[in-house]
């Protein structure tokens, strides 16, 4: 049986001194099969040597094939690497398979484009990521972001939510309200500048009142735009001093979360809270206890993780703790990312995919639908995203489909002017 070697050649990306070699390779069709195979192999070897291409380190890009519920496109060389991934036991419609698209509008403003694994432009990015197993689009929103934080604007989020809705993909949406003018993290929970000013004025408005007013106004704008999300996440890593009044024995911040969750529930929106991982997984019961005392009506408890060698075992322990103290809540990983490129050359799309699969599996069992939201998934050019600096999708994204048992039935490799068949 003839074996096919597919080499993807992107126009304008090869060194000029390979131009003649490429032209000769494209003219091979005039020769007989045996001669063509021998000559092509020799030429391909020369091409690899002069361009630095390597089948060992670079995924080969194959022509896109049609997708369906149980068929996804995977570049030919990636098939063997992905064969080991089975459908995760317990995964289902309620599992959150999320991609953070906060940077999406910013990337469009920068002139970036989104392509499939074969460098072909996709008609609809949301239809495309759904075909790769994603079921939730997540967006972070700041109160009054400016400068380098402008990408966090509500206006950008509404544009993206409208695009998701127009795609008719039935993707779920999650909006993370940061209650700050910038990204918030564990030790960085800066109050919006206007709220801080209002609190200091003679007729002071408390930060809690400002937060509730902001929530009402945001929901009103979303409803007016007809893009009310399925889920709203209240803050980010809120166990670390939400609104600056939650740390230690602070109580008002927790109570504010309860009031905000009540506002959201009236609108029929599911609630999530995002926490920073505690050193001891058992400590989550104290967070759940405080949420209960403050009457926070939430559906999901998300934990942000910064992966290390113990992350998966930690998440399994955390899942057991949540199932014990809050059995009606769904634990998810609300923020995570893995390198696919690094300076040490120890990361690639396959290590990235493997890390995602193992973490996702750790969140799921018969009691917890689990899931994760992949941070900055749509940030074109990031070493941790699903799109490289040219906008090409990375095969690691398909791990979400494999985790659901959506396997490619048959590879259909076609020849066009940008491909060489050996």
Question: Locations of the language-model features?
Answer:
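Hydrophobic faces of well-ordered beta-strands that scaffold small-molecule active sites
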Residues: 97-101, 137-139, 173-177, 232-234, ...
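Sec-dependent signal peptide cleavage junction
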Residues: 48-68
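Aromatic-lined substrate-binding rim segments of carbohydrate-active enzymes
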Residues: 121-184, 249-270, 315, 319
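Active-site cleft segment of glycoside hydrolase catalytic domains centered on the general acid/base Glu
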Residues: 154-155, 185-291, 296-298, 309-320, ...
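Active-site beta-loop-alpha junctions enriched in small/polar residues
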Residues: 102-104, 142-144, 176-180, 234-239, ...
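N-terminal carbohydrate-binding accessory modules
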Residues: 68-132
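Aromatic-rich peripheral "rim/lid" segments of glycoside hydrolase catalytic domains that contact
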Residues: 343-355, 362, 366-422
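Bacterial Sec-dependent N-terminal signal peptides
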Residues: 2-42
